[in-house]
């Protein structure tokens, strides 16, 4: 995402800032509306910064985040420019790279700010920025280049269903967007049916453990928690009662208080394997029932990102990576 860089410190901040959604519904929210979205043009989409009108079918699309690129690619549209995923050596998350195939769009960095001149040089006729964390500073300049599809509230509060719907409408592919949403939701629901062992299992989810302590998800409105809920699991009641830290949807715990994390399954996402190993070897963590049973599921950075910044592409990838590990933990 635009707010992330490759350094370990900023990677940790990114994990801590994993999105907390305002609502999990798939339709457009009251503050973001679409008109003319049946496939004809012009199309209007209203978002945080006003109403964006797309006068005709776009042919040169620029994606200001890899999630926006995912939305376009899933709809069969290959952007001419894509913001780099800073944690990846080739600038692409694996699911994005797979969808691109042999296509090689221009990549650009959005670390710290959006590259206005580089975007302008791509001569876009549509800019997708539903997950652009720099947009508050760059919208006015970007909107002078081409119509900009934005978020309704914030890049981390619009659901993936809502963002996909707006991107699809702007591309004149509203019906395809609705089908993608339905198909992806059905795939998640099918995993729940296939893996009944997950239903009712409690979980806690630690993000960015350090030598000083950990942050843990304490909101069932967190997007990752919602995905797991869609599989039949539920966030541990013990962590739901923890006081929120300065990061929304996150509680902070010192290492000596890790016992509150015990649940049927413990998930841990970290920026490096070293951090994951350090958590697992902590004496208090080792004493947790879930860890002793083998119901401890470590997530590397890419896996955490796939469910923290969801798109139809990332979620389908995540199902192949996450569900088998959860199933094994549930049976431990």
Question: What label would you give each PLM region?
Answer:
Residues 24-39:
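Bacterial lipoprotein signal-peptidase II cleavage site
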Residues 62-64, 68-75, 177-239:
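Basic- and aromatic-lined ligand-binding clefts that recognize polyanionic substrates
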Residues 261-332:
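Structured C-terminal subdomain patch of bacterial secreted/periplasmic proteins
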Residues 87-91, 135-137, 153-166, 200-227, ...:
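Extracytoplasmic ligand-binding site segments that recognize negatively charged/polar headgroups
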Residues 19-23:
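C-terminal motif of bacterial Sec signal peptides marking the signal peptidase cleavage site
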Residues 137-211, 308-332:
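Extracytoplasmic substrate-binding proteins
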Residues 116, 123-129, 147, 258, ...:
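Proline-aspartate-enriched helix->loop->beta-strand connector
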Residues 68-118, 131:
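A short, structured surface patch at a secondary-structure boundary
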